């Protein structure tokens, strides 16, 4: 007897289910798409325990005739294609004939359906086996219930995520379908609680508002273009409204939501330099084309497609977005808080002074952490870094760059600068001895550094350049310090300590701050409320998918409390599962950057001295939290070589 045998239908369906039915969201997607293909204008989705216990889809579509009910649950049985030519002209969302038998093979399924012309059909299937079939009274449409998903495949059930995660996956796919078909009214319920309701009036902007909030919808730019092969319609947000991941961009091809990286990349390219690095827009793009130009038969899940004229399509998307942005005013409203990536902000600050015209410098506005004494004039070297930056009351005078004060450092008597330069040098006749001596000095310096650990030697300020770089000296030579990076390191260590203990120091807000989220974001955050308290986010549920913040830690940078809260919330949504250690680190880095002095801000000599002294107290005074250098050293010997005082 041969070793190769044909698998029975039930086992084949179980294998197919592994590709088609990965989780409850897959079931919802397939069943809702079937309802849309059946010309439904209203679809209700009822879930229990994120679909693991029960999924029920009710539509008002065409229904299924009695004679087709059994055939519909056979593999590769479909009403949507007849021959191979139809495979290249697919207009429907489904066509493979795999979804229903795959779902029925791993669940307990009940179907009630009617075409409206005859009595309805009641069908019960368990694990792929038909248990009951009978006629029943039913309105036109289909009512299908899937219970105990994966009851006969415990290995698959074992890999399911938490209720919140699985529900988030379902809401995400329902959102995409709602955007793809705004002409269909969708209602989503979980444990009898309504989560989403779209009107079905065909206005995709209303759908976007119900998903991402009205505030985001107000910042949408309409996109529309047409070529010989493609028609593009959609909305994208103004550059001031961005997110930290591409997940907020949705691409629709002939009414089908698809995941296509090159399309998302084309949307980004359409913004060109309008977006900060690492930031992404919220966007919805619907593309209509001849079905011959797109292959949807790539994967059973039908989320991947291939285009035959991909480059032409990408070029059209890029040019359409660029043209749209040229027609509108892109200056953000004063009332809108524009979020910026802290690392991008600091990189931009480094170049602000390069092309600036000379101007009369003014004292910087320094942000103090809440709780600091704002009347204090003298800097203090200590534990609360921002005290250093309170401007003195007297009128400020521009710093005299590179002019030493009386108490400043005096050159070492060993310096060769004090001696006249001679054309002939005694060591020139013995270069080898000099190189050995120089090497010994370098080894000695390394040993001294190893003994001192991270201790930064005392630095004596001598001036400031462009309100950005501090010049200081000691007997080792000249130091150039990036003042923003220096205070960023100081603030980082201060906030890193504070973020670890938040319960004792809390400031009440006069007006609670409201945070509106999409349903997917809301569910993700709701799951982490207790963990978020550990990093200073005290959230209370407010309404359907909103939170309010009534208080915050006193050490939040003054005047930037709401921006800090928004940034931290975005980190939580991006991380999906909160890692407290990582979130504390990100929060400390973010706040240290926002609370630090910027480029083109002039400081008094006392302020500079206090900054350098406190930098010495940090555990790592050499790099900022982003890894950029804080100071650069030029030895006296290197300077003398530059000026040809030694050869």
Swiss-Prot record:
InterPro entries assigned: DNA_mismatch_repair_CS, DNA_mismatch_repair_MutL, DNA_mismatch_S5_2-like, HATPase_C_sf, MutL/Mlh/PMS, MutL/Mlh/Pms-like, MutL_C, MutL_C_dimsub
Superkingdom as given in the UniProt entry: Bacteria
GO molecular function: ATP binding; ATP hydrolysis activity; ATP-dependent DNA damage sensor activity; mismatched DNA binding
Disulphide bridges: none
CDD domains cross-referenced by the UniProt entry: HATPase_MutL-MLH-PMS-like (cd16926), MutL_Trans (cd00782)
GO BP, sorted A to Z: mismatch repair
Keywords: DNA damage, DNA repair
GO CC aspect terms: mismatch repair complex
UniProt family annotation: Belongs to the DNA mismatch repair MutL/HexB family.
Classification via PANTHER family: DNA MISMATCH REPAIR PROTEIN MLH, PMS, MUTL, DNA MISMATCH REPAIR PROTEIN MLH1
Function: This protein is involved in the repair of mismatches in DNA. It is required for dam-dependent methyl-directed DNA mismatch repair. May act as a 'molecular matchmaker', a protein that promotes the formation of a stable complex between two or more DNA-binding proteins in an ATP-dependent manner without itself being part of a final effector complex.
Descriptive protein name: DNA mismatch repair protein MutL
Source organism: Bacillus cereus (strain Q1)
Gene label: mutL
